[in-house]
Amino acid sequence: DVHVPPGQVALARQVARDTRRAGLAVASYGSYYRVGEAGEAPFEPVLQTAEALGAPVIRVWAGRRGSAEADAACRRRVAADARRIAALAAEAGLRVAFEFHANTLTDTNESAAALLAELAETSVGSYWQAPVGAPAEYCLAGLRAVGERLVHVHAFTWHRQSRARLPLADGEADWRRYLAAAAAVPGEH
């Protein structure tokens, strides 16, 4: 939402037109909405902007605390808000999906799977990316844990020890495995 800030509906419509003219499609609105953080920006302008863009999916973040720091009240708050925004998005024919990321409730395979399981009755999905510094087997386990909730894959390659970003080709062997696992998941992503 840096390029098309929430609430800037006219700009979103223009970007949608420009995107279609270029022969492209909007795959997602990459918002920075923090689920469960009521004191922050509201979801409704995010939803309106995604609609104007023609984005079928809105990326959201599972709170502001990592799973190790989150207490039960935090988890309940995130789950309740996720249900609320998923319902709003569904009314508009859209879907929300969590960023799979550090310092949120999707920062471990187990926590991400637990959150998605708690939201089983909703259409909430998940992005997936290989966690920085994690071994390939752990990354694959996370991708499998997301399973049929997979919406999109973020492709990056990081040096496991230094955590420096590398050319994607440097991770080719791992990415062949990740993409094969993603391809085995039903649906488009």
How should each PLM-predicted stretch be described?
Residues 5-12, 40-43, 68-78, 105, ...:
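Flexible, glycine- and charge-enriched loops at secondary-structure boundaries
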Residues 1-57, 83, 90, 121, ...:
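N-terminal pre-domain/capping segments
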Residues 29, 84-175:
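Acidic/histidine-rich catalytic cores of soluble enzymes
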Residues 50-71, 92-102:
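Active-site groove signature of glycoside hydrolases
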Residues 11-18, 42-49, 74, 78-85, ...:
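A general structural detector for well-ordered alpha-helical segments in enzyme core domains, enriched
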Residues 1-3, 173-189:
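Short, intrinsically disordered, charge-balanced linker/junction segments flanking boundaries
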Residues 1-3, 35, 64-71, 135-137, ...:
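A short acidic, helix-capping loop that chelates divalent metal ions and anchors anionic groups
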